[in-house]
């Protein structure tokens, strides 16, 4: 599975030499500050500012502020920044990872859980590791086969795989040291289990920490801690109760059995589905408080009424939970969204910092989860200190000033009142996995925020889970956007993306940047008073951290959702970012996922420096013309086809049958022209190796055929609109939205 440095890779379109990131390679020399000792690694992360040339952990330091003191690249010269080179990836899906740099070597995880080890100065491939994740696992996760990053400790690099494994490899050679399956064979996890691992690994006190995802399908969340040297499980903490209130023989037994179970009750869909509460992103160790913080996700199913019969707050959904690192013992929790029914996870970034609160310096957690509120908590005790919405939201009338609990808008409790609810934020949140940053120079938190509304409506007839599909307890035909000019125009006006400079003391926006649309990348803050961010429209920017002035722009030719990072080798500063459009927004939202532009996926790692001379090759593949669809379709089965499509296909191939630039747009797929060919792909799994699973156990042949007929109708409905959007003499789109506007 490991390929040595002699293995060759093609660079982007064959322009650069194999495995090369730098147009003018520099000789590699080890930097003096080393981080490869058992005792040294944790101390090196704690004292990261003593050797800022490295980037040793997902957020650089345990505080996860994503701030680097490097200032060779600064406001005065960032306009001279150039592409130094790029390293092409062989996974053209979403790239969300933050590479690590340890003593001059870059460790970058990519889609499908692959690992690339590169010389950080030259881009030379040192080794790569492919864990061979099965293609049919792709539809077991909600949001693309992404990976957000690795951990490093004692000469080993660790990362999770989409199918649930944790791999430890020798950092120098790439040879596997150990690997474990992080998902136990335990019936208490729910009958319909669907676990994936895509979060960044964290390592602290010799423990490798990893969570998982899967609550959209059926899962019971937990976090595991493994010995970094041996891979032995040290402890496990479940985030929601055992459905029989029995011990799991885990660190969480006492708190779940004596407190959390009472907030659920003995009945409801959670008993079958597991309850959710997966920790798929933020998982943080704070050396100041000596605590581990779990950022806990949504319920399984989403629907509160169906999940627990509308009873209780459902601990620990939508919460931060603090544990003792050595044992996993519960210390405290704060639940931001009790009774969650909107997919308002709290898995978004947990950051610690010191700031004044009522005239006293406090060590705090700052947190901007999906629900649209910014929270400040005491890091040691979990005490709620302050909270305020950082964007517009309509589900709550504010927070209780003493407890931080939401004061609900009754109209927003759609699962209890049975009404349709146009929710802001929607399930993609006001802030998602895109990392925020903090600058100790400006004392501002920089949030990549967005607004993506959603239509919530109870599933008709109660909770009816489907195999091989999302099971959230909603009517999936009601969240689809009506294909009328009026509906599209109204919805598009409600889509927004921002970079917010937020004052955590005054709890207010100091300045903001309006982007062309939502789903933009994470933030890096530097000592040069700079912010770096990639955008959904394929631009990579540097902004003035003090006022948001746009100081630099680069056309990356693909949407960027990953956060940048920075490092130095031999005294020279670099900025790097993984490029590659993807994630749940473009794969599920259909045509409206193109509001920022036609952001096709071209995946690579880009490195920038002040003396860069590389250029990306001209890219001209955005102007394809749609294939004229078959003229005839069976109107009698189209409605059933729409239901089946929204149930099984929409979350990967786009709302209303429209793609958004990453996975195949099925309206123009050749297979829709032939019934047998379509069934061979959808029913028999002809493309399983590429991530398209088979559905013959979930749907009948007639239901699969109804989907084909629906897609033919959608192709006919939208063909001329898509062609008109591309009209010029070279058939290259002039309108970046490619026909999504009426």
Curated annotation (Swiss-Prot):
Biased composition (Basic and acidic residues): 722-732
UniProt cross-references to SUPFAM superfamilies, sorted A to Z: Cytochrome c, Quinoprotein alcohol dehydrogenase-like
Cofactor(s) essential for the protein: pyrroloquinoline quinone; Ca(2+); heme c
Assigned keywords, A-Z: Calcium, Cell membrane, Disulfide bond, Electron transport, Heme, Iron, Membrane, Metal-binding, Oxidoreductase, PQQ, Respiratory chain, Signal, Transport
Domain Cytochrome c: 636-715
Cofactor binding note of this UniProt entry: Binds 1 PQQ group per subunit. Binds 1 Ca(2+) ion per subunit.
Matches recorded under Gene3D superfamilies: Cytochrome c-like domain (1.10.760.10), Quinoprotein alcohol dehydrogenase-like superfamily (2.140.10.10)
One Pfam short name: Cytochrome_CBB3
Keyword Flavoprotein listed: no
Region (Disordered): 722-742
SMART domains xref list: PQQ (SM00564)
Catalytic residues identified in the record: 343 (proton acceptor)
InterPro entries assigned: Cyt_c-like_dom (IPR009056), Cyt_c-like_dom_sf (IPR036909), PQQ_b-propeller_rpt (IPR018391), PQQ_MeOH/EtOH_DH (IPR017512), PQQ_rpt_dom (IPR002372), Quinoprotein_ADH-like_sf (IPR011047), Quinoprotein_DH_CS (IPR001479), TAT_signal (IPR006311)
Subunit structure: The alcohol dehydrogenase multicomponent enzyme system is composed of a dehydrogenase subunit I (AdhA) and a cytochrome c subunit II (AdhB).
Family annotation (NCBIfam families): PQQ_enz_alc_DH (TIGR03075)
Protein name: Alcohol dehydrogenase (quinone), dehydrogenase subunit
Organism from which the protein derives: Acetobacter aceti
Gene of this entry: adhA
